Amino acid sequence: MKKFDEINIIPFIDIMLVLLTVVLITASFISQGKIQVNVPKASTAVAFKSDELAKLLTVTADKQLYFNDKPISQEALEAEIAQWNKDQKVTLKIDAEASFQDFVTITDMLSKNEIKNVAIVSMKDKGKSAGKNSQESTPSQSVPTTP
């Protein structure tokens, strides 16, 4: 019988490098598609189930529009909104640094098409003593828009 004096760890290292590659590739796919938006703070917020948030409209600080995390022009967004049903649920995620005019423009598009079921994403403010890590981003129900 052959006696093993030492263990060959090269196959183990090969497997670990393959697993590391898979993890890094997977992590890069997960991080893509997230739009960095600094949402405003609110003292009250009502949490939603994510399946209720069918359509997501995002405005970044540099006035970029996104529909369901994909860039879109204002004209294309208007055409898209025109195709929606009047009872369509919409979530607005607007950066705190964006101008109020950006908010008014989006809500005006929704009002023209009589879409009134609108929620606004805000960050729940846990108080002045709370740190940044203790804040949660939750969509809060807004007052329906009026035409």
From Swiss-Prot:
* Gene3D superfamilies, alphabetized: 3.30.420.270
Q: Which domain of life is it from?
A: Bacteria
Q: So which stretches are on the Periplasmic side?
A: 31-147
Q: Which GO terms describe its biological process?
A: protein transport
* Composition bias type Polar residues, residue spans: 131-147
Q: Where is this region: Disordered?
A: 125-147
Q: Does Transmembrane show up as a keyword for this record?
A: yes
Q: Where in the cell is it found?
A: Cell inner membrane
Mainly resides where? membrane
Primary role: Involved in the TonB-dependent energy-dependent transport of various receptor-bound substrates.
| Record PANTHER family | BIOPOLYMER TRANSPORT PROTEIN EXBD (PTHR30558:SF12), EXBD MEMBRANE COMPONENT OF PMF-DRIVEN MACROMOLECULE IMPORT SYSTEM (PTHR30558)
| Protein name according to UniProt | Biopolymer transport protein ExbD
Naturally occurring in which organism (per UniProt): Haemophilus influenzae (strain ATCC 51907 / DSM 11121 / KW20 / Rd)
State the gene name recorded for this protein. Answer: exbD
